[in-house]
């Protein structure tokens, strides 16, 4: 609710609150289904040791009877540029305080998407990440501290999530994180650190495609964006 005011990302797909589900009529559910779940809005991805003719046979057997419907054009209002900081403080009886900082970032096909992904890895991937070394190991101010991207199709979020140790206020925790971000922005990344994180990404992408299920899902994912051939060029974007 803080990051998005217009775009549907402001609430979960299933609804903003439980009452939305409770108030849904069966006609509303059917209308949603028949609008979005159509052959025109589908991608069939197959990764298996099968002849193409056999794939056609099975595809026709299981899917040809599905009725085609009107094409749906996805048209969502873009989120306006955020010009001021938004804050929300929640008080609850919990074991540890938690701090979340979110920055708007590029969409999944944008030029800066992979830059943000790489930055999140440099900051917090494993015990060689800057956050771990500086704010958990050397100067233990956090129990946990991570940076990650949401991976959204439209303009997404770069998120930093941390749990400060007892005695470290949320304000102090925020200042420590901002100091690390300012330092990151003011200095060039060393070639060794940069290459190490690129290698980790390349390894993850490679191992990710070892199973047929992951291959099929990735092929469909890239076809959704542009072309399934994008699966072969993803690492080059880093």
Residue ranges and their predicted role:
Residues 63, 123-127, 178-186:
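Short amphipathic alpha-helical signal-transduction/dimerization elements
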Residues 33:
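Conserved, carboxylate-rich catalytic/transport cores that coordinate ions
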Residues 1-19, 41-47, 97-107, 133-238:
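M16 family metallopeptidases and their MPP-like homologs
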Residues 52-56, 111, 168-172:
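Short, conserved charged micro-motifs
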Residues 5-6, 10, 38-39, 43-107, ...:
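An aromatic/glycine/proline-enriched structural segment found at the starts
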